[in-house]
Curated annotation (Swiss-Prot):
Taxonomic lineage of the native organism: Bacteria, Pseudomonadati, Pseudomonadota, Gammaproteobacteria, Vibrionales
Protein name, entry field: tRNA U34 carboxymethyltransferase
Family from the record: Belongs to the class I-like SAM-binding methyltransferase superfamily. CmoB family.
EC number: 2.5.1.-
SUPFAM superfamilies found in the cross-reference section: S-adenosyl-L-methionine-dependent methyltransferases
Keywords, comma-separated and alphabetical: Transferase, tRNA processing
Function noted in UniProt: Catalyzes carboxymethyl transfer from carboxy-S-adenosyl-L-methionine (Cx-SAM) to 5-hydroxyuridine (ho5U) to form 5-carboxymethoxyuridine (cmo5U) at position 34 in tRNAs.
Gene name tied to this protein: cmoB
Entry's Gene Ontology BP terms: tRNA wobble uridine modification
Residues noted as binding carboxy-S-adenosyl-L-methionine in the record, renumbered to the chain: K91, W105, K110, G130, D152, P153, S154, I181, E182, M196, Y200, R315
Reactions it catalyzes: carboxy-S-adenosyl-L-methionine + 5-hydroxyuridine(34) in tRNA = 5-carboxymethoxyuridine(34) in tRNA + S-adenosyl-L-homocysteine + H(+)
Subunit-structure text: Homotetramer.
A GO term for molecular function: transferase activity, transferring alkyl or aryl (other than methyl) groups
Keyword Transferase belongs to the record: yes
Amino acid sequence: MFNFANFYQLLAQDTVLQPWLNTLPQQLTDWQNAEHGDIERWIKALKKIPEGCADNIDLKSSVTLSNNTPLIDGERKKLENLLQTFHPWRKGPFTVHDIHIDTEWRSDWKWDRLLPHITPLKNRSVLDVGCGNGYHMWRMLGEEARLCVGIDPSHLFLIQFEAIRKLMGNDQRAHLLPLGIEQLPELNAFDTVFSMGVLYHRRSPLDHLIQLKNQLVAGGELVLETLVIDGDENAVLMPVDRYAQMRNVYFFPSARALKVWLESVGFVDVKIVDECVTTTGEQRSTEWMKHNSLPEYLDPNDSTKTIEGHPAPKRAILIAKKPD
């Protein structure tokens, strides 16, 4: 179904990451053997996507690829229909041969908020936990990261990533593995680890922070983004059921409380670098994501609250270091 041989070869040649080969191949074999109702339809469409490197690729200011000679209308429409097979597209946007994949999230806005605050990614190895379809990994490569590894257990996100990678000429600097972080050994191998939009889905947030720390080299940097509430270092919201229609959500600390949590598990130099209310311009339904989105999840009479009565989504970005 999927061939991870190139990634295994990369691990075999990397003395720091090589021990991952003790567990990873069997995990990915088990994943491939598990059935998923839509996977055959998606793979059939993926095989039809043309392979080959575009003449022009921009990963620095966007994720855009084009040829010097544009696709003819029929070819472009065929490609657009194939990409629509992978609906819903949640993270992006992408522009592919004049096809604008207008995703649910303006993930580029988040990237613009965090980029000025992080250690430059040039020549760094990066792990992106809960990477979605890999949009931010392409932006990391635009900042000249040496290697980007993303993990996310979603079949659809892997298909979307492989579709974009195929159009990119099968770029081997980025790899998406269909795993959760709990399946990773303590690699202590990455210069930078990103965890964005994951923490509130974890039953034990402190354990998640420890898992992230265990993926970093000594002195490595964590970039953590999550939903927060207003309040002091003791403020935490734990929704009884749903939050903005999301199930499986647990802890929403204040940014100040999250800073304390990071310090309590051994991170140093912890900084709150951004807090931002999520707007309906940043998250909304589109032709590429036709399901309900943030506008339907807010109280129609009070946009400062979710339909359950909780504070409306607000996200914070924190930067922290693993001690040397």
